[in-house]
UniProtKB/Swiss-Prot annotation:
The name this protein goes by in its record: Probable methylmalonate-semialdehyde/malonate-semialdehyde dehydrogenase [acylating], mitochondrial
Function comment: Probable malonate and methylmalonate semialdehyde dehydrogenase involved in the catabolism of valine, thymine, and compounds catabolized by way of beta-alanine, including uracil and cytidine.
InterPro entries linked to this entry: Ald_DH/histidinol_DH, Ald_DH_C, Ald_DH_CS_CYS, Ald_DH_N, Aldehyde_DH_dom, MeMal-semiAld_DH
Family named by the database record: Belongs to the aldehyde dehydrogenase family.
GO MF annotations in UniProt: malonate-semialdehyde dehydrogenase (acetylating) activity; methylmalonate-semialdehyde dehydrogenase (acylating, NAD) activity
E.C. number(s) listed in UniProt: 1.2.1.27
Domain of life per record: Eukaryota
Length: 521
């Protein structure tokens, strides 16, 4: 298969079809079904987080190049919107098959650019693939509604029709999953899509474009541009882009929501989080501690649904030393090496910020019971590594609690009752996810009913729903009306047209020929 030839030498695992052949390869744009070299003079160096060696140079696309992508999308929309829903379904059926057969190539690229372990990178791809698989059900997902005989001889029905050109702005932490939340739903509904992947991790998106070509998607239906702030402004301001999807930080999400919304666009923004896990003393101790460690430190804590805050209720606070021992045993190393539990964080700046937030906890009176800030990884001394870190005796006014750390750091608070735990979580401005660990059904039911968070797990540490549901973060974690994927995702990418028609029964044409002599009455 052609795709297998797109992977560079094993020491680099760098995608070649999407890059030039320079000594330091450059990432190309994807315009009108082709990989195109940018003519910009402004480039961003992309570093391997495990070594800080330059992997590729990413262009800050020019205004003309980005406008070319829009023109390509506009042109493709004219025919794509008229394509049958069955033909769009066929593209998704082929795409999911191609992705599944090439998960390891995608995972290698993600590990090289983002740093997460290979097994975690495959999970990144799989969760995105599940959205593609759900899009294969578009023939039932995009159905409208009908009421016959709403009045005498009158029927009313509605269509769910595409919007036009849409755009997705993706983050660095899920290089495959988040773009796959965006463009498959958009184009299966009949839209065209422009994707701006994170300038830190564009490779997975470029691989997906190669796969999309192989699946038979027409040129221009999906285009890819690159850049930073100027590219975001272009997407928010361009009058031909009808809707914008974004996943990322609070600051960027609020900015995009306000700017794109001011320009009349439909916008959905998934933003920051402070996800709490509540540990009851009646929980299954071994299972709970294992799940806490995995959810807090997996992907080096760089998940929007990472369980970054533990709330120990009553005697459960005595479990913290056992949790520390489990976390201490996790292996920190380069993501491509066997046995690695967590790799590096994305950049030296991220590492510095994480370390500063940990230090702020100590200065404010918390205890660092496991300190991973000075970890050394043999052979990767220049990497952005932070080991599992646990801070206990944290209070809600501390900076390490109020800010999203986005690293392998678990902050631990203690309360006496479930009511105090619920109040603590509801007072936090974020509402992405939360979990409770208990064997008591009544306690779990109370928690589910009283908690004001969009996604709740009961003995499930990271309750991200499968795509037949929607990703329903709330409060400070989301801006918009319709959430990502699932039924709400279809609603976001479509507009409703309602038709009311009147055909009077008295106007029905005769169904048999009149053979009697005409009398001219």
């Amino acid at each position: 298969m052609a795709l297998l030839r797109l992977v560079a030498t094993e020491c680099r695992n760098v995608l070649q079809r999407g890059y030039s052949t320079a000594s330091v390869p450059t990432t190309k744009m994807f315009i009108d079904g082709k990989f195109v070299e940018s003519k910009t003079n402004d480039w961003i160096d992309l570093h391997d987080p495990a070594t800080n060696e330059v992997v590729t140079r990413v262009p800050k696309c020019t205004q003309d190049e980005m406008q070319t992508a829009v023109e390509s999308s506009k042109k493709a929309y004219k025919t794509w919107r008229q394509s049958s829903i069955l033909s769009r379904q066929q593209v998704m059926l082929k795409l999911q098959h191609i992705i599944r057969n090439n998960m390891s190539e995608l995972a290698k690229n993600i590990t090289k650019e983002q740093g997460k372990t290979l097994i975690d990178a495959e999970g990144d791809v799989l969760r995105g693939l599940q959205v593609v698989e759900h899009c294969c059900s578009i023939t039932s997902l995009q159905m409208g509604e009908t009421v016959p005989n709403i009045a005498k001889d009158m029927d009313t029905y509605s269509y769910h029709l595409p919007l036009g050109v849409t755009a997705g702005i993706a983050p660095f932490n899920f290089p495959a999953m988040i773009p796959l939340w965006m463009f498959p739903v958009a184009i299966t509904c009949g839209n065209t899509s422009i994707i701006k992947p994170s300038e830190r991790v564009p490779g997975a998106t470029m691989l997906l474009m190669e796969m999309l070509n192989e699946a038979g998607c027409p040129p221009g239906v999906v285009n890819v541009i690159h850049g930073a702030h100027d590219a975001v402004n272009f997407v928010c301001d361009n009058p031909d882009i009808r809707a914008v999807s974004f996943v990322g930080s609070d600051q960027a999400g609020k900015y995009i929501y306000e700017r794109a919304g001011r320009n009349g666009k439909r916008v959905q923004c998934n933003m920051g989080a402070k996800n709490h896990g509540v540990i009851m003393a009646d929980a299954n101790k071994e299972n709970t501690l294992n799940q806490l460690a995995g959810a807090a430190f997996g992907a080096a804590g760089q998940r929007c649904m990472a369980l970054s805050t533990a709330v120990f209720v009553g005697e459960a606070r005595n479990w913290i030393p056992d949790l520390v021992e489990r976390a201490r045993k996790l292996k920190v190393n380069a993501g491509h090496l066997p046995g690695t539990d967590l790799g590096p964080v994305i950049s030296p700046q991220s590492k510095q910020r994480i370390n500063e937030l940990v230090e702020s906890g100590a200065k404010e009176g918390a205890k660092i019971v496991l300190d991973g800030r000075n970890i050394k990884v043999e052979g990767f001394e220049k990497g952005n590594f932070v080991g599992p870190t646990i801070i206990s005796d944290v209070t809600p006014n501390m900076k390490c609690y109020t800010e999203e750390i986005f690293g392998p750091v678990l902050v631990c608070l203690s309360v006496d009752t479930i009511d105090e735990a619920i109040e603590l979580i509801n007072n936090n401005p974020y509402g992405n996810g939360t979990a409770i660990f208990t064997t008591n059904g009544a306690t779990a039911r109370k928690f589910v009913n009283d908690i004001d968070v969009g996604q709740v797990g009961v003995n499930v540490p990271i309750p991200v729903p499968l795509p037949m549901f929607s990703f329903t973060g709330s409060r400070g974690s989301f801006l918009g009306d319709c959430h990502f994927y699932g039924k709400q995702g279809i609603k976001f990418y479509t507009q409703t047209k309602t038709v009311t028609q009147l055909w009077r029964e008295g106007d029905v044409s005769h169904t048999k020929a009149a053979v009697a002599m005409p009398t001219m009455k």
